[in-house]
UniProtKB/Swiss-Prot annotation:
Gene3D superfamilies registered for this protein in UniProt: 2.40.50.580, 3.40.1350.60
Organism: Alkalilimnicola ehrlichii (strain ATCC BAA-1101 / DSM 17681 / MLHE-1)
InterPro entries documented for this protein: SfsA, SfsA_C, SfsA_N
Family in the record: Belongs to the SfsA family.
CDD domains referenced in this protein's UniProt entry, alphabetically: SfsA-like_bacterial
Xref: PANTHER family: SUGAR FERMENTATION STIMULATION PROTEIN A
NCBIfam families, per database record: sfsA
A Pfam family of this chain: SfsA_N
Protein name: Sugar fermentation stimulation protein homolog
Annotated GO MF terms: DNA binding
């Protein structure tokens, strides 16, 4: 994924009200940007951090700028725009970068799951070797701790837990279902459920896996030019 227009750099002043961030651009202009991330942004919203924003020319938008990236350590850039995760994963799947899900030639977005309170992020279909369609949920991962471990979620996610329950039920009914973590940071080597943050989510993830849901992780190294998921990481649920 290449950004439509070059990102502008700056320094984070503060994130507040969940969806807003005050930033001083490199030009010296102070702006308020939309923060497209509903989580706690653990370790990714420290005042003074180097950040990058995109700018929209849409006159209907209240905030022209959107926070896209943050540098959390020297040379470690993290993508915080959760709204880009679905497109990044779709791009990677169509390029064959996740071996377990290769062969699907059709992707539908935001597909309602019949008789379930959920829309699947992606529905993979028309497999070249006749494999069943796959309901797929995408989650953006930005949080990490020591030893290269990425964590999800970074805040309690009742909605995420409900979606896992639906995927588990669909798996028990014989459908193929999968969860793909979109890891937008280059400094981690595996993904764990964040039990200390949301124990219910971790329990639901383990239960869904036991019921036949599949779980994968794709990693990319964001830059001000673009983001591409190129590497599969293990999902570890001890």
């Amino acid at each position: 994924m290449i950004f439509d227009t070059p990102l502008q750099g700056g320094q984070l002043i503060r994130r507040y009200k969940r969806f807003l961030a005050d930033i001083t651009l490199d030009s010296g202009e102070r702006i308020t940007a939309h923060c497209p991330n509903t989580g706690s942004m653990m370790g990714c919203a420290e005042p003074g951090s180097r950040v990058w924003v995109s700018r929209s020319d849409n006159p209907r938008r209240k905030y022209a700028y959107t926070w896209e990236l943050v540098e959390v350590a020297a040379g470690v850039v993290v993508g915080v725009h959760t709204g880009r995760a679905n497109a990044l994963v779709e791009e990677a799947l169509l390029a064959g970068r996740l071996p377990a899900l290769r062969g699907y030639r059709r992707v539908r977005r935001e597909v309602r799951v019949v008789n379930r309170p959920m829309r699947a992020d992606l529905l993979l279909g028309d497999h070249s070797e006749g494999e069943p369609d796959c309901l797929l949920e995408v989650k953006n991962v930005t949080a990490a701790v020591a030893d290269g471990v990425a964590l999800f979620p970074d805040a309690v996610s009742a909605r995420g837990t409900r979606h896992l329950d639906v995927l588990a039920a669909e798996a028990r009914a014989g459908r193929r279902t999968a969860l793909v973590f979109c890891v937008q940071r280059p400094d981690v080597r595996e993904v764990h459920p964040a039990d200390a943050i949301d124990r219910a989510y971790g329990q639901a993830l383990r239960a869904a896996l036991a019921d036949g849901m599949e779980a994968y992780a794709l990693q990319g190294g964001p830059s001000p030019e673009g983001i591409e998921l190129t590497r599969e990481l293990p999902v570890h649920c001890p």
